[in-house]
């Protein structure tokens, strides 16, 4: 499991359940566990990247689900409403949970539970992993990246 620091205030399982209902989704259990332990934040021990055989990209921070630590930090709900509802540049079946250094989201697919990177500039949804657990397993320190 990953460790996040500089997290926002804790959320309860009840609060997570209410957000799932309001968005009409079910979050993966591993993602819920991260939000319950540390509500968003940056990865401990410096910069990290997701790396697979076909793709590599940095991870700036994991989005909090509620209760931001300070103003200017978007929550999952805020980011979803901005990109899906207001700007219509992200498919409604994607839930953002983290962002890269350019502000582009890593998302969980509501229909399949897979993890995607959404390149908003090029309008691309890049399939990364079949599930959140597999994605977490491929996060490495930046200095170990090839």
What are these regions (language model features)?
Residues 1-102, 143-146:
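A surface-exposed partner-binding patch
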Residues 104-109:
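Short, surface-exposed beta-strand/loop micro-motifs that present aromatic residues
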Residues 117-118:
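Short, compact, well-ordered microdomains
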Residues 125-146:
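Compact, glycine/acidic-enriched structural inserts
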